[in-house]
Design a protein with these regions (language model features):
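C-terminal non-catalytic interaction/assembly regions of soluble proteins
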Residues: 195-196, 206-269, 273-278, 284-288
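Short, surface-exposed, charge-dense and proline/glycine-enriched linear segments
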Residues: 43-52, 82-92, 235-244, 266-275
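Short, Lys/Arg-enriched charge-dense amphipathic segments
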Residues: 38-44, 74-85, 225-239, 261-266, ...
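Short acidic, gly/pro-rich beta-turn/loop elements at beta-sheet edges
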Residues: 187, 221, 300
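Conserved mixed alpha/beta catalytic, RNA-binding, or beta-rich assembly cores of soluble enzyme
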Residues: 1-38, 43-78, 85-218, 295
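C-terminal edge-of-domain segments
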Residues: 151-163, 167-170, 269-302
């Protein structure tokens, strides 16, 4: 009863542990994965010299848990219903598809099958003979039985990426929104420009980790308002820092006259993302310019 007011959804529930009065058992009661209760229970039990009690099925059967994977890689999950289907399929011994827009380190966990953007299994020929990879049409020439792949995980920054009938999207925070604007541009105009970026690109808003601009805009109320609304930091750079950014950018004589640098939105986005790759070049409308860059990001499997 005491925790009832705090129980809302799997994505926001807090970690809750229960310890008996003798300190013999530490039970992970709520939010074992996303909230970190399972890991906390193990650490607490070690300190108390108690017995940890973890009841989540994927942990008991040593199966891949998409919510744990997302948390360890600092990603957001979309479609928790599909995430449950992933766990259920793995526990039932079925294959689960895995597609990623990003490179991966380590081997895929047991039960996951690497797929392309259309949900079709793909495989490396490194350790398979040609005969092994062409056993029958049921194996689609990949060495993997395709008939049981009904659900899967997609690591993506795009809202439209759904390779599987039931797709769990895992979205990394790796994008930077570069912005420039007229002085004292209203917050509504800034917000509308940002929304148009999402509409045009199909990027998840949750894939953005920061907003970037020139230091002349560090007190720009409209951008500060967007930063607060999206709950991400707003970073700025000097004219000299932006000039040093390598690459080819969309020049503007007017912008250079005002700021001293030929482009603000593209250069600031690239610089903030660690000299990352431009995913959307400069677009301008109603006194606001925007660009999107992505920092280098990889998936890590233990």
């Amino acid at each position: 009863r005491s925790i009832a007011p705090y129980v809302a959804s799997k994505k926001s529930d807090p970690a809750v542990l229960v310890v008996d009065e003798c300190g013999k058992f530490v039970i992970s009661l709520l939010s074992g994965h996303l909230g970190g209760a399972n890991e906390l229970a193990l650490k607490t039990a070690e300190i108390l010299e108690a017995i940890p009690v973890v009841t989540t099925a994927t942990d008991l059967h040593h199966r891949f848990a998409v919510d744990v994977f997302a948390k360890k890689n600092n990603c957001n999950i979309f479609n928790m219903k599909a995430a449950k289907e992933v766990s259920a399929a793995l526990l039932a011994g079925k294959k689960v598809g895995f597609y990623s827009e990003f490179p991966t380190d380590g081997e895929l966990p047991e039960g996951l099958v690497r797929c392309d953007e259309y949900g079709n299994p793909v495989s490396s020929m490194d350790d398979r003979s040609e005969e092994e990879t062409q056993k029958s049409s049921d194996f689609n020439g990949t060495g993997t039985d395709c008939t049981n792949i009904d659900c899967g995980v997609a690591v993506t920054v795009h809202t439209s990426c759904n390779p599987f009938i039931s797709t769990t999207q895992v979205v990394p925070k790796c994008l930077t929104l570069g912005m420039g604007c007229r002085k004292d541009k209203d917050a509504r105009g800034i917000a509308e420009a940002a929304q148009k970026v999402l509409d045009r690109s199909g990027f998840h808003k949750e894939a953005f980790e920061q907003i970037a601009s020139i230091d002349l805009k560090k007190e720009e109320k409209g951008i500060l308002s967007l930063s607060q609304d999206w709950q991400i930091p707003f970073v700025t750079y000097t004219e000299e820092e932006l000039k040093q950014v390598p690459g080819e950018f969309t020049p503007s004589p007017f912008v250079k006259k005002i700021t001293g640098v030929d482009n603000v939105c593209e250069r600031s986005a690239v610089l903030a993302s660690g000299n990352g790759r431009l995913r959307q070049r400069k677009t301008g409308e109603n006194g606001v310019t925007t660009a999107v860059a992505a920092r280098e990001w990889r998936i890590h499997f233990e």
